[in-house]
Amino acid sequence: MVRPRLARLVTSFVATGALVFSAATAAHATAIGSTPVRTFEYSVGGMTMKVPTGCMFTHAIRGSGKRITYQNAGVDCAFVAALSSGFCNWRIDFTYADTNNRTYRTSRGRTHSECKIDPMRNNSPQRLPRYGKACAHLVVNGVRRVSQCHHITK
């Protein structure tokens, strides 16, 4: 259990290092990108929860053209962040927008009431009607906290 999480964490840090200067990447066949989750606080049942620095939101996508064969997004935390209570009342949404940045499809994830340090979601294969971008969004306690996108191009 620790080994797969460690491998995913290392992969997300390597991908982040490679993509630090680009917010979105072209998804011709495979793309993976990570975005740091900023520190934030939220309230659950009267308790204040704090997510410290040290978590990355990673979005992976595979396919060709407007056809997505695999899509996954999740959070990996390290150091002090890995010891926190994690994310409560979370969900991961996938959105698809055209080249004018108009969102035309949303796959809303189920809201999970339990607290989890490593939330993750797979999405079903998609055939998109147009080029643009595919994004994954982490929503915690009803507030979008972090997003990661890939451009879908010819």
Locate the predicted segments by residue.
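Short, solvent-exposed, Trp/other aromatic-anchored flexible loops in extracytoplasmic proteins
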Residues: 109-133
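Short, exposed beta-strand-loop hairpins at the edges of beta-sheets
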Residues: 125-129, 133-153
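Cysteine-centric signal of extracytoplasmic or virion-exposed proteins
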Residues: 55, 77, 88, 115, ...
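Solvent-exposed serine/threonine-rich low-complexity stretches and specific carbohydrate-binding patches
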Residues: 100-117, 151-152
